[in-house]
Amino acid sequence: MYALVDGLLEELNCDVVFKIPIFGGIPIYESVVVTWIIMAAVFLLCFFLGRNLSVENPGRRQVAVEAGVKFLNDFFSETLGEKGKDYIPYLATVIIYIGIANLIGLLGFKPPTKDMNVTAALAVMSIVLIEVAGIRAKGTKRWLKSFAEPMPVILPINILEIFIKPLSLCMRLFGNVLGSFVIMELLKMVVPAIVPAVFSCYFDIFDGLIQAYVFVFLTGLFIKEATE
C-alpha cells in the first residue's frame, strides 16, 4: 500500500526540467516540455500532410486527410448545431492534443494531462470560449438576461454554474487519467505481469481517447447550450 501511495505521489509530482534565467528564474515543468513536443509533432505532421495538395488530382494522402477533416467537421456539426460551427477548429485542435497527450505515455513520456495545471488550463479556455460564444450569439444584454432564466430566483445558481463547468471538465479529465494509474498499480500487486501489460495498453490507448472525446463532447454541448 505504501508503494501505491509513493507511486501516486510521484505521478502527481511534476519535475522542473529547466529554468529561464529572467525574473529570478521562470521554472519550465515537464508537462510544458512534453506539450511543446506534442505541438512540434502536430505542426510537422500538418506541414507534411498539407504539402502538394491538388484540387484536380488528389493523391491518397490528400484523400485520407480530407476524409478525416470531413469526419471531424460532421461530428462536431451535429454536436454544436448551426450556430456553433465557427468553433469546430478549436474542438478539433483540443481533441487532437488531449488524444496525443494521453497516448504519449506509450513512448515513455509523462502525459501532460496528469498535471492538474494542464487540465485546468484546458477547462478554463473552453469555458471562456463557451461564454464568448454565448455573447456572440445572443448579444451582451440577452446573455446577461439569460442568467435569470427561466426565473430570477435561480440567478445565483446560473452564475455558480459558470465556475462549476470548468471544475467539472478539469476534474473529470484529471481524475480519469489518474484513476487509470491507480487501477494499474493495484493490478500489478495482485496478478501476474502479463495481465497488467494488457490493461496498460487499454488504459493508455482506449481510455485516453475516450477521455479526449468526452472532454470535447461536453464542451460542444455547452457551446450549443450557450448559443441557443
Locate each region found by the language model.
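Selective transmembrane helix interface/packing segments
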Residues: 1-228
